[in-house]
């Protein structure tokens, strides 16, 4: 076929289309430049500018020093004994699927300076990973080409109002341990942001963080609910989508108590860091206040994220805390999501982890200022109350908390754990009042037992297979389990084909056929599944250690490989192409 000349009718049409496309591109670029300030777009790391894709070093250690005469803060290489804080990053992502970050602060300095310094040194050692993670996950959030003006303005206004309300509460309650920890958390985030931008200066008065800057990395869980509450037209959350599996297993004879968690997430998020924070914070702002019990914490996390987000924590207080998301399907409850009177979930879990000594105190701290966002079932395991080989203490070993907008329900589940020998969590509320209030009965009526607490696929698999767990290795196998092509409990009767990769302890939704027929979004083909497992035991938790594996399960299935997957075009900077890693033991000297 001969291409039409511009003078012909077809040529004039081609020329008009070309001009329109060029104009659209220019406008898109201008809009992108205009909106970059609103979205908090981040620059390439300073040392990598002009060199293409940033390349993180195999290891890096940096310290933040305070000049006693000038009061100036200065970043230096290496670990210095007089530093306000130091951090070391070992990048083994290509070898194990994990980078490892160790961060210490110095108790000779006040809490506020320690917190700010913690953020500074973390960004200083992980800036390349932060850049790549941002590009993979949130660069277009409220940004060019995917911008919803109304929603993004509402989100920005909500976050600004919430930050302002918290600032007032910190001023009004300047002797409160709770608000002291909130302030330290925000200072740590401020230090992270300042350090990445190359403008380190401790804020001596009021300070703020950018509502659509690095705060976006902290509120990824809260955003799932804020999007709905603030009427975002297009949300990324698939109806029915699972978000983590967890199992607490009492071994025969009560000889050990194992705690395990696997995170379900979009595969773009598989740039992982295992973190160790050793803070020297006091509980409250007073000089005579004692050290916070949760200053030592090990957790699975992500670049630029100062909490777990999975969530899974091993704490120096003897607690292990973890959650799976239960969400909210009842539109009438979104009225409880307000910018004032609430602290977003990510920050409440940081404060509870740092201040609590047991499950009761953890729940009391966490349920204050319920935001109604990132609605989860939390499990608080207190290893101090567990006696290996002993009878049930009756209470304190396991506390379960469930949150939805306007409601938090808490109960001690120790007796049930000892009676059944396991507690499983799989994104469905266990409390009847929460289940009913969250709108799930309507989904059960429409779609059947897939949405029910006892009848969902994972509920049935855990009930059938928990007795196979007798040590750490068998716990790891169960938490990686996905034999959806052969397991009758993985069948979806309303699907074509019936076997479904979502219906397993560790999902592999990428393996569902793109041309299949499915009753709701969670069962479709998606770049989504279980992306890790973390397991600890009585002895490991006491030593702040764990077993961990990174990447989608490949025990019964082929390993995930970006280049051969249907999602090869998705941005996944810094990630290995083939995810075929074995479990490792995570420990620090």
Curated annotation (Swiss-Prot):
UniProt subcellular location: Lysosome lumen
Keyword set includes Disulfide bond: yes
Signal peptide: 1-41
Any single Pfam family the record assigns to this protein: Phospholip_B
InterPro entries membership: PLipase_B-like (IPR007000), PLipase_B-like_dom1 (IPR043040), PLipase_B-like_dom2 (IPR043041), PLipase_B-like_dom3 (IPR043042)
The UniProt record lists the keyword Repeat: no
Classification via Gene3D superfamilies: 3.60.60.20, Phospholipase B-like, domain 1, Phospholipase B-like, domain 2
GO biological processes: phospholipid catabolic process
A cellular component annotation (GO) from this entry: lysosomal lumen
Keywords, ordered alphabetically: Disulfide bond, Glycoprotein, Hydrolase, Lipid degradation, Lipid metabolism, Lysosome, Signal
Residues glycosylated per entry: 88, 110, 174, 231, 436, 465, 515
Main location as per UniProt: other
GO MF assignments: phospholipase activity
EC number: 3.1.1.-
Disulfide-linked positions: 142-152, 492-495
PTM per Swiss-Prot/TrEMBL: Glycosylated; contains mannose 6-phosphate sugars.
Function: Putative phospholipase.
Quaternary structure and interacting proteins, as annotated: Interacts with IGF2R.
Family: Belongs to the phospholipase B-like family.
Protein name (Swiss-Prot/TrEMBL): Putative phospholipase B-like 2
Source organism per UniProt: Bos taurus (Bovine)
Native organism taxonomy: Eukaryota, Metazoa, Chordata, Craniata, Vertebrata
